[in-house]
A protein has these predicted regions:
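Basic nucleic-acid-binding alpha-helical/helix-turn surface characteristic of O6-alkylguanine DNA
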Residues: 1-96, 144-171
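Residue-level recognition of specific faces of alpha-helices
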Residues: 75-78, 112, 125, 140
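Active-site and channel-lining beta-strand-loop segments
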Residues: 13-15, 117-121
Length: 171
């Protein structure tokens, strides 16, 4: 299986490809180093993500998992960067239990690209994270995405900038 190790701000990560799709993103260095066009594209997109230039990924993915887990992972990909959802919110939307959502999150073979870090406990508690340095990594990823998130028009309505709250001069 072609693999490509990457040095990132979170340490060494390894991308794996099988049959023309990304199948894993693992913490640490893989056993193989075979650069394919898809692995290079994925590595470039991850670099852009870490540089704050990208908030999502456009890659063929084929994570190994049950049909239920695949449904959860698809739901994770629909959570916008810079936002979070609770395990309970996802459970209600998928008609299942929060614990099942947590199990699917923990089994996610392509973290970051399938953004399981965007799921938090009820009440806003950060919850767990199985990758990297655990919760510290999850906090880092969420902070990165909040900084990279494009401003929404409503973000500007309540915060006038000094000097910009007066009318424009007339010609």
């Amino acid at each position: 299986m072609p693999q490509l190790p990457l040095l990132t701000p979170l340490g060494m990560l390894t991308l794996s490809e099988e049959d023309g799709a990304i199948v894993a993103l693992d913490w640490g260095r893989g056993r193989d180093r075979t650069e394919t066009p898809l692995l290079r594209r994925a590595a470039d997109q991850l670099q852009d993500y870490f540089d704050g230039l990208r908030t999502g990924f456009d890659l063929p993915l084929n994570p190994t998992g049950s049909p239920f887990r695949r449904r959860v992972w698809d739901a994770l990909r629909a959570i916008p960067a810079g936002e979070t959802r609770s395990y309970g919110d996802l459970a209600r939307s998928l008609g299942t239990a929060s614990r099942a959502i947590g199990g699917a999150n923990g089994a996610n073979p392509i973290p970051i690209i399938i953004p399981c870090h965007r799921v938090v406990a009820s009440g806003g508690a950060i919850g767990g994270y199985s990758g990297g340095d655990g919760v510290a990594t999850k906090r880092w990823l969420l902070a990165l995405e909040r900084r990279a998130r494009p401003a929404a028009p409503d973000d500007l309505l309540d915060a006038p900038t000094a000097g910009h709250d007066r009318p424009a001069p007339t010609p």
